[in-house]
Amino acid sequence: MTDEWLDTINWSVDGLIPVIAQDENGGKILMVAWMNRDALKRTVETGEAVYWSRSRKKLWHKGEESGHTQIVQAIHLDCDKDVLLLSVEQKGGIACHTGRQSCFFRQLKNGEWVITEPVIKDPSQIYTQ
């Protein structure tokens, strides 16, 4: 397979594209991250999600520290070709570094942000730094 398919994407001026990771079974949105060309290429090659960390300025293989990898079942490109949607099998059932299933665990209710998802596992037990 050639890399021409990467040229179809409307990359940002920084060479990035936002990526939504969605649970393949329930359809729940797990997280939003970023990819550059190399991250997307490695994701396709390995079958596991590899993102670009904007804060650390390096590739980030999801689950490299926690073991909570994302097995990619499908990759979709939106109509404007500037957002990716990954359908994933979330290993360990935890996508968020806070120990929750989803990074979207706060909901606006009556003008206040309310936590709507429990912590599945204490992050101190996940990350041993």
Swiss-Prot record:
Nucleotidyltransferase among keywords: no
Keywords: Amino-acid biosynthesis, Cytoplasm, Histidine biosynthesis, Hydrolase, Magnesium, Metal-binding, Zinc
Cofactor detail note: Binds 1 Mg(2+) ion per subunit. Binds 1 zinc ion per subunit.
Pathway linked to the protein: Amino-acid biosynthesis; L-histidine biosynthesis; L-histidine from 5-phospho-alpha-D-ribose 1-diphosphate: step 3/9
NCBIfam families: PRK00051.1
Residues reported in the UniProt entry to bind Zn(2+): 79, 96, 103
Compartments (UniProt record): Cytoplasm
Signal sequence segment: none
Cofactor: Mg(2+); Zn(2+)
Short name of any one Pfam family annotated for the protein: PRA-CH
Binding-site residues, Mg(2+): 78, 80, 82
Keyword Transmembrane helix attached: no
Function recorded in the entry: Catalyzes the hydrolysis of the adenine ring of phosphoribosyl-AMP.
GO biological process, one term: L-histidine biosynthetic process
Major site of localization recorded for this protein: cytoplasm
Protein name: Phosphoribosyl-AMP cyclohydrolase
Gene symbol of the encoding locus: hisI
Molecular function GO labels: magnesium ion binding; phosphoribosyl-AMP cyclohydrolase activity; zinc ion binding
Organism: Nitrosomonas eutropha (strain DSM 101675 / C91 / Nm57)
Subunit text: Homodimer.
Catalytic activity reported: 1-(5-phospho-beta-D-ribosyl)-5'-AMP + H2O = 1-(5-phospho-beta-D-ribosyl)-5-[(5-phospho-beta-D-ribosylamino)methylideneamino]imidazole-4-carboxamide
GO CC field: cytoplasm
EC id: 3.5.4.19
Family: Belongs to the PRA-CH family.
